[in-house]
UniProtKB/Swiss-Prot annotation:
Residues 57-98 are annotated as: Disordered. It comes from Onion yellows phytoplasma (strain OY-M). GO terms for molecular function: rRNA binding; structural constituent of ribosome. The gene is rplC. PROSITE patterns: RIBOSOMAL_L3. Keywords: Ribonucleoprotein, Ribosomal protein, RNA-binding, rRNA-binding. This is Large ribosomal subunit protein uL3. The keyword Cytoplasm does not apply. One of the primary rRNA binding proteins, it binds directly near the 3'-end of the 23S rRNA, where it nucleates assembly of the 50S subunit.
Amino acid sequence: MLGHFKKATTAPKRFIKEINFSADVNSNLANLAVGALITNDLFQVGDLVDVTGTSKGKGFAGSIKRHNQSRGPESHGSRYHRRPGSMGPIKGKLKGKKLPGHMGHETVTIQNLAILSVDTEKNLFLIKGNVPGPNKGFVIIKSAVKKLTKEQTHAKN
C-alpha cells in the first residue's frame, strides 16, 4: 500500500475507502484532490443521514440469542431447553435457516438519523440514534437515501 500513498503524495492513512458521488449534488467535492481532508461542513443541523459501520462482534451464539427464537419447556422431564428444534425432513442445511452461528461483526447501515449539532472546530457531529460499531470505530456518514416525510419524522421523534 505504500506505493499507492507515494503515488498520491500523501502520508499513509489508517483506512482507505473509495466513495462515489455526483459532482452536481456536492459541488464542494468536485475539486478535491486525492487524499484531501473532508471536513464536516457538508452537513447542517437537522439533516438526515445514513450511518454505515461494522457492528460489534458477539462470537458464537445460539438461535435463541441470535434470532430471538422461543425456548422449550424447562421442567416436567423436558430435555429440550435452548435447542433450535427440528430441521424437518431435508437433506443438508438450507441457506438462510435460523441456526446457531457467529453473531455480529457485519456491515450495518442505520437510516435516517438526524444531526443534532455540528462542531466545526473539532470536526465532530452529534447524531441522534444508534451508531453501529465500537467506540472510536470507523463509520461512513452519507446523506439519507430514503428521506422521511414530515409526518414520519414527527412520529419517529
